[in-house]
Amino acid sequence: KPVYDLYDRLIESGLTSGQKFTADPLPLDKHVPTSLLEDIVFRKIMYTQQDRYEQQLKKLGITADNAYTCTCYLEQVGNTPKQGDILSWAESSAVVYANSVLGARCNRNSGMLELMGSIAGFVPEFGLLTDEGRKAHWLVEVKCTRRPEAQLLGSAIGMKVMEDVPYVRGLDTWLGTELNDENRAYLKDFGA
């Protein structure tokens, strides 16, 4: 509740994001039918502030009613950063993809901190925003006779390196060097 109260204070002060933004996926989809038990558990107990939150994001500058996505970097969303761009994103897979594939710079912080960054127009400079924070701590060499399954390989690497930065070598054997739709999909599933 304190988060929603803070959002109300920001709105009452007239603050909004300097640019339109997307947000993490919603936990509930109003267009999907639910049972009485689901309504009680999800709408009356777990997500009682959902409508309030959505209205607050509209007032703070969310792009559209359907701007809740974990793939905010896709062309159809209209939020694809360029290499070197500093981002204020909270969705973990989008942060990894932006850093690894697109060459943007972004930390994975809470949605609240990222919204504050969007309103302020800047974010704290630490971690993956710095050259030092982007240096790899692990060298991962992929040596397989066929293209590895993206989610399996990404999960295995992630479980080993945890919060460290890996440098993955060898995927170009199957992906080449062009960032086409097929490679984008593979790297998205890989978690890169």
State the predicted function of each range:
Residues 1-192:
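Non-transmembrane, aqueous-exposed alpha-helical and coiled segments at domain scale
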